[in-house]
Amino acid sequence: MKKGTVLNSDISSVISRLGHTDTLVVCDAGLPIPKSTTRIDMALTQGVPSFMQVLGVVTNEMQVEAVIIAEEIKQHNPQLHETLLTHLEQLQKHQGNTIEIRYTTHEQFKQQTAESQAVIRSGECSPYANIILCAGVTF
């Protein structure tokens, strides 16, 4: 049995295949996922698992150098936005690097998901609970 934090074989596999600047999406239950993009569906029911639970597990295993977030989260989900910024600040300290935070429109965000290696769908049912993680290197 794998000893690391990620037991889901699909998530573990996609993270292990990421190269520098490749992207991986963690999203809420409502984000449309392009047919051409690998879908890893973790959603069990509304809110389970939460966006932050999935993001926490993924970022424990993935080196992150930048993130892309929809601008709309600031107005429509400010509590999650603050939680997300706190998580990214802690992740920077843990990884020992600066994580660039880029904002874009939700429409542009949805278009960018098509370029990702995979989209991991959580059970989150709050607005704009989505992030594109850009892979960094550990050296």
UniProtKB/Swiss-Prot annotation:
**EC category name:** isomerase
A matching Pfam family: RbsD_FucU
The Swiss-Prot or TrEMBL record annotates one GO molecular function as: D-ribose pyranase activity
Which of this chain's residues are annotated to bind substrate? Answer: 28, 106, 128-130
GO CC terms in record: cytosol
Name where it's found.
Cytoplasm
Q: Does the record carry Iron-sulfur as a key word?
A: no
Q: Which InterPro entries does this entry report, sorted A to Z? A: D-ribose_pyranase, RbsD-like_sf, RbsD_FucU
Active site residues per record? 20
Indicate the quaternary assembly: Homodecamer.
As for what it does, the entry says: Catalyzes the interconversion of beta-pyran and beta-furan forms of D-ribose.
Family stated for the protein in its record: Belongs to the RbsD / FucU family. RbsD subfamily.
The name this protein goes by in its record: D-ribose pyranase
